[in-house]
């Protein structure tokens, strides 16, 4: 499991045990199916998507499987919660339209203590589809300025990917490194702007910076991942194939990229059947 997933699962299990036992010693044999159901119901209200609720199920089932392997009699708890229906490709991926992209880009270059760092992180997401965790772990050694490439090492798929570095993205990163980045021995590209400056930023810092960029542009969005969808949509609109989009997004399977076919208006129009107006 990825570090972020492990942290999420640990937090869920910790909440379950605290709700049931408080400060008392944990006796998993004393936990009943109703305890798990009530906890699951309360946790489900915190998530707005089936995927979020599914993460609670995965955390609980993983913990009960672990306790079973340890010899605890918790077989009755394994089947208490089930995954919600989550139909793949059921919805359109949300993305910024061209006017919203222009508003976001025009809002960059603002004056502030971390302005250039924010600009560089937004450009990484918008131009390369870099995830928040990947931005946070980006190293100075990952950028080949002469070749115009960038290496993403700590990716979701746990492999190294080499991507071309667009001029606008490279310029934004270079401006941050030359004009704003604190003097530090850290090899991380993006570091804290306040003490301790030797520490790299975390994914939450990237998410917060993108949310603030949305707000400055007057856009009603909060999710940083929206910029990754936007990049895929722009590639399709520019004539790129799904295979090319999959390569840039670094998807292992082309099936993962198929959802973006719904945004390919150019090719969809070519295969659309005439509307039977006489029937309507």
Residue ranges, per PLM feature:
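Conserved catalytic core of the tyrosine transesterase superfamily
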Residues: 1-280
């Amino acid at each position: 499991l990825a570090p972020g997933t492990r942290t999420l699962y640990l937090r869920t299990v910790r909440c379950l045990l605290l709700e049931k036992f408080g400060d008392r010693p944990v006796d998993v044999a004393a936990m009943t199916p109703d305890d798990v159901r009530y906890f699951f119901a309360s946790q489900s209200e915190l998530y707005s998507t089936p995927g979020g609720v599914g993460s609670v199920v995965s955390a609980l089932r993983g913990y009960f499987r672990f306790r079973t392997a340890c010899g605890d009699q918790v077989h009755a708890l394994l089947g208490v919660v089930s995954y919600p229906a989550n139909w793949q490709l059921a919805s359109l991926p949300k993305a910024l339209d061209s006017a919203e992209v222009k508003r976001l880009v025009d809002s960059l270059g603002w004056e502030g203590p971390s302005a250039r760092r924010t600009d560089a992180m937004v450009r990484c997401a918008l131009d390369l589809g870099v995830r928040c965790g990947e931005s946070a772990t980006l190293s100075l050694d990952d950028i080949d300025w002469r070749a115009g490439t960038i290496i993403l090492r700590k990716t979701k798929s746990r492999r190294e990917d080499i991507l071309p570095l667009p001029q606008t993205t490279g310029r934004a990163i270079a401006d941050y490194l030359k004009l704003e980045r604190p003097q530090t021995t850290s090899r991380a590209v993006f570091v804290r702007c306040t003490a301790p400056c030797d520490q790299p930023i975390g994914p939450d810092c990237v998410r917060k910076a993108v949310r603030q960029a949305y707000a400055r542009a007057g856009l009603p969005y909060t999710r940083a991942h929206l910029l990754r969808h936007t990049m895929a949509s722009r590639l399709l609109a520019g004539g790129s194939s799904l295979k090319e989009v999959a390569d840039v997004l670094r998807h292992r399977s082309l099936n993962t990229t198929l959802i973006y076919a719904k945004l390919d208006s150019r090719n969809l129009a070519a295969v659309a059947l005439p509307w039977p107006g006489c029937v309507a």
